[in-house]
């Protein structure tokens, strides 16, 4: 059995995965980067250092269960988005490891943006999996964008003009004393509020206005704080 290896070293997770020739995920492991309580993120050199330490741990585990000779190709995220100037040093950890593996195994190396991974992962298990034309919403820690996917290419057609939804949630979460990044803990709190009415409290937030496909979220941030 041959496998495709995927590597991603984004700002807050070190991730590797294997898929078989049918596209089924047969291995998927990740390590969340450590952020001290009260902080709103990591400096790039801190993230890079943690990725460099995490990758050997993940690969040691993977190669205990799979033979390196069965890897047919290596894919890696090398930048945040497919736009000019998009760059983060954190991705260098994954790119460096991917280059070494592909060269050692004499197999192809494919580079993608982190955003490509978000969009394709979301469409993979839907009726859009084989579609060549669709609109995707990308909500992450640093990005809130409306994207048009056409024939393998992404173009931005909308989004936020100021902060992203991820930044808004993380700022609220750290103010509440949660560990950054705060999305998962906030999800759990929101679920508890839905199931236990005594925990919920209504907050009147300003309406979000859209202009030519773009919005601003700073008004919500001001209302919350």
Regions found by a protein language model. Give the residues of each.
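Short beta-strand-loop/turn "lid" adjacent to the catalytic site in phosphate-handling enzymes
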Residues: 60-99
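Short glycine-rich, Thr/Ser-proximal phosphate-binding strand/loop in the N-terminal lobe
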Residues: 10-49, 155-156
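Acidic, glycine-rich active-site loops and adjacent beta-strand->loop/helix elements
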Residues: 13, 77-82, 113-119, 143
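General beta-strand structural signal in soluble alpha/beta enzymes
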Residues: 7, 75-76, 109-114
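A short helix-loop
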Residues: 2, 9-10, 17, 27-28, ...
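Conserved phosphate-binding catalytic cores of ATP/NTP-utilizing and phosphoryl-transfer enzymes
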Residues: 1-2, 107-135
């Amino acid at each position: 059995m041959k496998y495709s290896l995927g590597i991603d070293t984004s700002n807050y997770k070190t991730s590797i995965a294997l898929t078989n020739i049918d596209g089924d995920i047969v291995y998927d492991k990740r390590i969340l980067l450590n952020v001290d309580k009260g902080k709103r993120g990591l400096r790039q050199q801190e993230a890079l250092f943690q990725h460099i330490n995490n990758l050997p741990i993940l690969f040691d585990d993977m190669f205990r269960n799979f033979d390196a000779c069965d890897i047919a190709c290596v894919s890696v995220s090398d930048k945040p988005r497919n736009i000019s100037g998009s760059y983060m040093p954190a991705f260098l950890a994954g790119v460096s490891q991917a280059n070494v593996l592909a060269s050692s195994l004499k197999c192809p190396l494919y580079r993608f943006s982190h955003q490509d991974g978000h969009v394709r992962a979301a469409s993979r298990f839907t009726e859009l999996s084989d579609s060549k034309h669709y609109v995707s919403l990308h909500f992450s820690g640093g990005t809130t964008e409306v994207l048009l996917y056409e024939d393998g290419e992404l173009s931005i057609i909308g989004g936020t003009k100021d902060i992203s939804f991820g930044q808004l949630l993380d700022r609220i979460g750290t103010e509440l004393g949660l560990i950054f990044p705060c999305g998962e803990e906030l999800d759990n709190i929101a679920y508890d509020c839905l199931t236990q009415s005594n925990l919920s409290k209504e907050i009147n937030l300003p309406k979000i206005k859209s202009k030519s496909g773009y919005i601003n979220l700073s008004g919500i941030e001001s209302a919350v704080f």
